[in-house]
């Protein structure tokens, strides 16, 4: 990637606002403050073509754009990305991504022109095949001890600094085979957080094997779709998966775990990757 200009110093991830609290059913004195997460319209442009507008926490937007391009099948890898630039316009941010001209056919196939809701991955998709598109199965990988998966979820919690400040964000983390989260991203949208993580993995050249993705949310089918698109073998979620997510995980050779909390978890697909 030849050009990367992604300073986000002008875009805070949260701010303080005046509130009136109720405690024990009693109104408290005015003049108190609380920290709330920022939510900013972010437009993605590929080779000058407007593709999507999402509501995103305005941090790690380079990772977000790269992860989105990868998981949407717009680019096949970092070799297809020529540069990323950020620009403030009106009331939002434009992320301009320059990609190889050979990717423009795929771009047109996946093009979305919409104003998305928070973390909404389906806004603007017109037909069902566009939603449940073909994703290549993930490569087989060695089993990891279940203790390491549980450790990874606990490790993710310690990386949720924005959530600690605001209580409003999801996190997606990448844990190595030992269960240590070595990379994490947060966002108001769970899909956005996972895109940021996948983009960061690609940008930093971190291989998806061995290891796992852990998320502080439920596991929707699109979370599984993004995980499989990135070649990640295991997705562990703190909450429940959907039926479609389970079917897609089984089809794409992704080991899907839900309700990963403390010493418990439920394995919904490909349990051979989880060892005692």
Curated annotation (Swiss-Prot):
Keywords, ordered alphabetically: Cytoplasm, Molybdenum cofactor biosynthesis
Pfam families for the chain: FdhD-NarQ (PF02634)
Any one Gene Ontology molecular-function term assigned to this protein's record: sulfurtransferase activity
Single Gene Ontology BP annotation: Mo-molybdopterin cofactor biosynthetic process
Localization terms from the record: Cytoplasm
GO cellular component, one term: cytoplasm
Active-site residues, Swiss-Prot/TrEMBL: 120 (cysteine persulfide intermediate)
InterPro entries in alphabetical order: Cytidine_deaminase-like (IPR016193), FdhD (IPR003786)
Reported function: Required for formate dehydrogenase (FDH) activity. Acts as a sulfur carrier protein that transfers sulfur from IscS to the molybdenum cofactor prior to its insertion into FDH.
Similarity comment: family membership: Belongs to the FdhD family.
HAMAP family xref list: FdhD
The name this protein goes by in its record: Sulfur carrier protein FdhD
Gene name of this polypeptide: fdhD
